[in-house]
Amino acid sequence: VRIAKTGYTGEPIGYELYCESRDARYFWDRLIELGARPTALGARDTLRMEASLPLYGHEMGECEFGGEIPVYAVPLAKFAVSFAEEKGDFIGRAALKRQFEAFQRIMNRDYSAIADLPYRIQPVYLSGKGVLRKGFPVYSKDAWAEGKPVGYVTSGTMIPYFKTEGEGLETVITSETGKRSIGLAYLDSRICQDFDLEIDIRGKRQPAKVVAWHIRQDAAPYVRPILPDHPAPAAPHCDAPYAEKAAALLKKAQENHLWRQHRCINLIP
């Protein structure tokens, strides 16, 4: 059995097992005996959407505008393609190089090469009513859009999540659940993070936003949902001005340092 620290879910702790076909049933039955719970493709699809992972036929392959979706339209391409000299030449290298250079310029808000990468896949969050579905047209109120679609939803659904209490390191995952409609969209490359959009859902335009990510994996063993409309934490109450509190803290640190230097005996051999 080969075990790889890879996956298609975005979870910080997860593995893929590779075994001979003849052994697959044994491993399946054994994992079930040990408490594993099987899930269907629907669960996998919601997880990969949360992690902004592409799926062929949605974020890769044919585009609804005609032609194929460029490789560098998918954010993960920057990790998958190498132009190192030792790689040598390969089929498609020149085209990928043009896309890569356009991608770099676009990241710096330089759209001079946008013709080589006119659209990109980006995560979107629906703040209005409804559920995102593949093919829904996306609009922008910016003048340059001229009222025309600036892209379309490539993947979308309603996804459950566990609600949390507290902030930062004190965050606690509760048993209470919520739902949110998120997805991925193929958008004009001039659109970037925090861009306000409108998505046509069965004839009604609903507000949406481009986000950096739907989940974060910084605190294993669980991912945390990122909710753009989550209220910001209240600023900590402080009776004294910050400058005075900082000065008092520095004074305490200095006194502690002198105490350790001159009034303590080092008992460590």
Stretches with model-predicted labels:
Residues 6-8, 126-128, 176, 263-266:
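Short Gly/Pro-enriched turn/cap motifs at secondary-structure boundaries
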Residues 28-31, 135, 250:
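A generic alpha-helix structural signal
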